[in-house]
Amino acid sequence: MMGGEKAKDFKGTIGKLFRYIGKYKAAVVVVAIFAIGSTVFNVVCPKVLGKATTALSEGIMNKIAGNGGIDFTYIGKILLFCLGLYVLSVAFSFVQGFIMTGVTQKVCYRMRREVSEKINRMPMSYFESRTYGEVLSRITNDIDTMGNGLNQSITQLITSVSTVIGVIVMMLTISPLMTLISVLILPISIMLMMFVIKKSQRFFKQQQEYVGHINGQVEEVYGGHNVIKAFNKENDVRREFHETNETLYKSAWKSQFFSGLMQPIMMFVGNLGYVAVAISGAALAIRGTIQIGDIQAFIQYVKNLTQPVQQVAQVTNMMQQMAAAAERVFELLEEKEEEQIVENPVSTEGIKGEVTFEHVKFGYNSDQIIIKDFSAHVKPGQQVAIVGPTGAGKTTMVKLLMRFYDVNGGAILLDGHNIKDFNRRELRDVFGMVLQDTWLFKGTIMENIRYGRLDATDEEVIAAAKAAHAHRFISALPGGYNMELNEEITNISQGQKQLLTIARAILADNPVLILDEATSSVDTRTEHRIQRAMDNLMKGRTSFVIAHRLSTIKNADIILVMKDGDIIEQGNHDELMAQNGFYADLYNSQWS
């Protein structure tokens, strides 16, 4: 996002947010009732205390004149009554705070759950066009910011507005003239408040954006710190982080600076109100129009009038941050999803594994086609190797087969049915995958292998590990299958990680296998063991193997040679070597 960009739709975002919490409107109504009740009890007290002040001043004057004394009993009753009102006000405030906190946490819980579910339905293109840190920032920072703002802004807004109304009513009962003088400060306060809001709004949005950028950079640097050190890129990373951090600093400073202006401005305006009330009150008291206690109560009301106006200003700033955060979360929730279910889906039961590519055309951007005309027919149980230089489109073909992306033209058929006619989840259950990048999670080795099929028994997990030639090294580890992998998965080697992911794929027992550089991260000895296990595993299953080490796919039934998105050669190893073409050059180059 460009620096200084305003929120796209502040009013619309606030409207969406309040519609989102509509499920809890009964609780919000109760919060409003208790907030207003707390305000009423609080607003009544100054006038009641004014009576005590009047009684005290009259008692002193009578005592000086020798006509009586101070009526402490009457004053004591007033003070006890006020104490009761304040206790009720605090009790009501506690109840509304308790309920509102519960509502806020439920909203945040629901939103996190919906975001988590949404992420599972998002297309691969969404994640490949954004950093992980930026996506995570919306789930953590933005939802937390929204929750904090929601918890404080609703109750404070209700309390502030009801206080202003209540105070003005009570002031009118004392002196309409003094009320008019006091209320004249409100337009000044509102104009100053709107000026500050207008200035700060865009910076709050920018601040939230760059928090996401910071998280993304930190995640990338932390995840790739070995590569950064190996290439001596610490200074470059530091410079890039400094630039992003500098932008965040400036936007945060400006937003907080304008936000901080609110209180001193409102204090200045409030002090003007005090001066005006003191002068007009003194003049009215001299004329005998009002009593001393009324002036004391009125001054309290003036203070109570400026304070909620300040609170409204603070709430507005809070709502700016809340809206900026909520807007980013709603943007994620409103992103286009993958179509998970189709009408009259084809069943995946009894899938044999016949795969046909019919003139497939694809580009990550519609104006940059990388696969121009891909056609191939794979019979059930055949082993298909896809080879070619980097960028030829090998991995892209796998993504299309799994429907991580949909083709721009042509079709991919599974057992004669267009893969778009299957429910996406059921289609992906057909495929077992071992990717270039190993993905394991914090937990035991047994749990990581069982991820391939959650209902598998311990014996089945161990059998899969043996088939992947992982049983020996697992048994030698402290705790064996119950050894806990740490959060960074650094307590086993890269080759061992690869073996575990292969064991997971074996356990899943899918009819079609996809091995994307499955042996590229292991040493030659381990590669031979894995290759023997893979040969046994692939018997009777349609298998797609992507490998740079051409020696590993010599026994493939079909080898598809890709270059610049097209198949330029196909056949088995002997046929392609006899052609003495591009494949032969690739193969010979690895042995030269």
Where are these regions (language model features)?
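Short intracellular "coupling" helices and adjacent cytoplasmic loop segments at the cytosolic face
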Residues: 2-5, 105, 113-137, 141-143, ...
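Juxtamembrane loop-to-helix connectors within ABC transporter transmembrane domains
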Residues: 13, 21, 100, 120-164, ...
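Alpha-helical segments in transporter systems
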Residues: 15-18, 26-51, 78, 82, ...
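Transmembrane helices of ABC transporter permease
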Residues: 23, 27-40, 51, 85, ...
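An intracellular "coupling" helix at the cytosolic face of ABC transporter transmembrane type-1 domains
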Residues: 23-26, 124-125, 143-150, 154, ...
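Transmembrane helix-loop-helix hairpins at lipid-water interfaces of multipass membrane proteins
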Residues: 28-92, 173-177, 288-292
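Helix-loop-helix
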Residues: 170-184, 254-327, 332-333
